[in-house]
């Protein structure tokens, strides 16, 4: 019986156990399993990432874009739970922020008042919630010593553009006004998120500068910034590396109303005018990510406008690495570095 046939018959829970076991193997053993390295655009795919993609292919998992919306959302939650693991944290409590569901993560040993990150999850504006990014938020908070409040903004297609943007801005304004109730120091507030959440975070940072709201730092993890142009990385990596062209097209069609303007800076921050006083940024991109080039273009735009920016490409990783801290060594190391950057910026 071929291995691919065995893997395809396993339940998702057992597949996750197999994945964790194989990703715990020494790198040379993983390399023998997956064969020669994948090299593209002068970059080599991390061995554990290559193994993960290989196992997903064997499992014949349908892409989220092929499923009915609610099934796709459930699949993301399921996969994130399997890949993120149960990360330790001092305490967690659910609350409401600007009439939106939210979750506060307080790291072990946190002082009564300290730095606070407002986090917006990824998922193409149509998937993702507090559960899908629970492990990532736990990991970031505990490793950085920074409180995190994750916000569950409205999703498309039920709530189309600019609903998510409006929710993100409202949530940040609420946090500024109520920081003390969360244990947040108003002088050490940050905003951050991954993918679509990175887009929202970039938008909030611009609003904060225009409105004079306190914001000390922005953490943008493989953000989408340009809904118009097709970049080189989008051509190179939109098949076979987790985030597909079909998924991105569905996300665009779900979130943006028919006839909408994809150059609207609330959707594509690359087209925004950068005001004075924008918070310093750390922009993380993945080498094998279709969104790589537009994320890096936004980092350059900020820098050209005088914003203090650090850009870091993780050349061997793929889109979504924030969600696999429980199984992937290379992804876990990258997210640990994100936590260190957050700690350094805010003094966690």
Kindly give the residue locations of the regions a language model identified:
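A glycine/proline-hinged amphipathic helix-loop "lid/cap" segment
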Residues: 1-104, 347-348
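Alpha/beta hydrolase fold serine-hydrolase catalytic domain that processes acyl esters and thioesters
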Residues: 2, 186-187, 202-348
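Glycine-rich nucleophile elbow surrounding the catalytic serine of serine-hydrolase chemistry
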Residues: 193-203
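Active-site glycine-rich loops that stabilize anionic/oxyanionic intermediates
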Residues: 121-127, 288
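Short amphipathic alpha-helix adjacent to the substrate-entry channel of hydrolases
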Residues: 131-150
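Short beta-strand-to-loop junctions in surface cap/lid or active-site-entrance loops
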Residues: 102-113, 270-275
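Short beta-strand element of the alpha/beta-hydrolase
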Residues: 113-122
